[in-house]
UniProtKB/Swiss-Prot annotation:
Zn-finger segments (CCHC-type): 120-137
Annotated region (Interaction with PRP8), positions in chain: 200-224
Keyword Glycoprotein: yes
Assembly mode: Belongs to the CWC complex (or CEF1-associated complex), a spliceosome sub-complex reminiscent of a late-stage spliceosome composed of the U2, U5 and U6 snRNAs and at least BUD13, BUD31, BRR2, CDC40, CEF1, CLF1, CUS1, CWC2, CWC15, CWC21, CWC22, CWC23, CWC24, CWC25, CWC27, ECM2, HSH155, IST3, ISY1, LEA1, MSL1, NTC20, PRP8, PRP9, PRP11, PRP19, PRP21, PRP22, PRP45, PRP46, SLU7, SMB1, SMD1, SMD2, SMD3, SMX2, SMX3, SNT309, SNU114, SPP2, SYF1, SYF2, RSE1 and YJU2. Interacts with BRR2, ECM2, PRP18 and PRP22.
Biological processes, Gene Ontology terms: generation of catalytic spliceosome for second transesterification step; mRNA splicing, via spliceosome
Domain of life: Eukaryota
UniProt xrefs under PANTHER family: PRE-MRNA-SPLICING FACTOR SLU7 (PTHR12942:SF2), STEP II SPLICING FACTOR SLU7 (PTHR12942)
Protein name: Pre-mRNA-splicing factor SLU7
Protein modification: N-glycosylated.
Length: 382
């Protein structure tokens, strides 16, 4: 029985596969496309009118009444419909359709004075007969009351964003943006810039400028030109006047000193001139080494102390020893910091000077115990 049931199942699967292959050949379909790609989703809106009566989620695709075979992958075809963008080729730039940021005015229904107490228009949709908390419409974020200029009583009208925009327009990051405030800010900046240029000191023109030789001569004479152009004495009283900064021609860059010398003392990478105060040349590597400062100097001193302490303890570099790890600075930084600090304190600590009189025996000072106190202590402690 089991073998017969298996054979029947195999025959049914073979027949079903043959049937599907035959249908795919007739409809010119690719049988290797999975079902979740071939089937149209339930929310797909571009189904042809001939297929409206049929559920789009079926595997089989119907043919049109005229005999044409419909595209079973129509929901994967990108077509420009209803003003949508054609994004088949994303490598080419395309101009968008723009954002329609429009509003529509919703005026409340006219009501009598008698009904105005019991009825009020909705601030959300603008209709009368219910309040905003009872409104069944979708809550709108952009709500605004604007005066109605056409009305004599100046009744308010509700300004609501238009809802006929497509999804791309509503989800755009610039949706609802108005550049009016930014334009006003830019115009204010331009006005301030023009006023600043107009109010700038006009005396600073080409006539007040002079060459470098004249500047050096004026500095040697302790004179300088003020904002008007007249010469002033260089003293503390006239220090607030206009004065230009100058640089003497005798000044020259430090790297120019190496032009006629065989050695180059200027380091272009660090832009420093090699001097004895900055560092020295290493004899082994023939490289210029800067003097250590700050934490680098402290680490170097601590490393030297660790090396000397290891030699005192009998540790040698050429001999392999398990205890060598205990005398490495990297493995024991806190230990050597403590030892170095302790040794410095011992060196700076002055020996205490004790006189001979302090070491001599002295007579005991104090109150002598009475016989009664001795007997009492003897009874307590035996």
């Amino acid at each position: 029985m089991n073998n017969n049931s298996r054979n029947n199942e195999n025959r049914s699967t073979i027949n079903r596969n043959k049937r599907q292959l035959q249908q795919a050949k007739e409809k010119n379909e690719n049988i290797h496309i999975p079902r979740y790609i071939r089937n149209q989703p339930w929310y797909y809106k571009d189904t042809p009118k001939e297929q409206e009566g049929k559920k789009p989620g079926n595997d089989d695709t119907s043919t049109a009444e005229g005999g044409e075979k419909s595209d079973y992958l129509v929901h994967h075809r990108q077509k420009a419909k209803g003003g949508a963008l054609d994004i088949d080729n994303n490598s080419e730039p395309k101009i968008g359709m723009g954002i329609k940021d429009e509003f529509k005015l919703i005026r409340p229904q006219k009501m009598s004075v008698r009904d105005s107490h019991s009825l009020s228009f909705c601030r959300n949709c603008g209709e009368a007969g219910h309040k905003e908390k009872d409104c069944m419409e979708k809550p709108r974020k952009m709500q605004k009351l604007v005066p109605d200029l056409n009305s004599q009583k100046n009744n308010g009208t509700v300004l609501v964003r238009a809802t006929d925009d497509d999804w791309d327009s509503r989800k755009d990051r610039w949706y609802g943006y108005s550049g009016k405030e930014y334009n006003e800010l830019i115009s204010k900046w331009e006005r301030d810039k023009r006023n600043k240029i107009k109010g700038k000191d006009k005396s600073q023109t080409d006539e007040t400028l002079w060459d470098t030789d004249e500047e050096i001569e004026l500095m040697k004479l302790e004179l300088y030109k003020d904002s008007v152009g007249s010469l002033k004495k260089d003293d503390a009283d006239n220090s607030q006047l206009y004065r230009t900064s100058t640089r003497l021609r005798e000044d020259k860059a430090a790297y120019l000193n190496d032009i006629n010398s065989t050695e180059s003392n200027y380091d272009p990478k660090s832009r420093l001139y090699k001097t004895e105060t900055l560092g020295a040349v290493d004899e082994k590597s023939k490289m210029f080494r800067r003097h250590l400062t700050g934490e680098g100097l402290k680490l170097n001193e601590l490393n030297q102390f660790a090396r000397s302490h290891a030699k005192e303890m009998g540790i040698r570099d050429e001999i392999e020893d398990k205890e060598k790890v205990q005398h490495v600075l990297v493995a024991n930084p806190t230990k050597y910091e403590y030892l170095k600090k302790k040794r410095e304190q011992e060196e700076t600590k002055q020996p205490k000077i004790v006189s001979i009189g302090d070491l001599e025996a002295r007579k005991v000072d104090g109150t002598k115990q009475s016989e009664e106190q001795r007997n009492h202590l003897k009874d307590l402690y035996g």
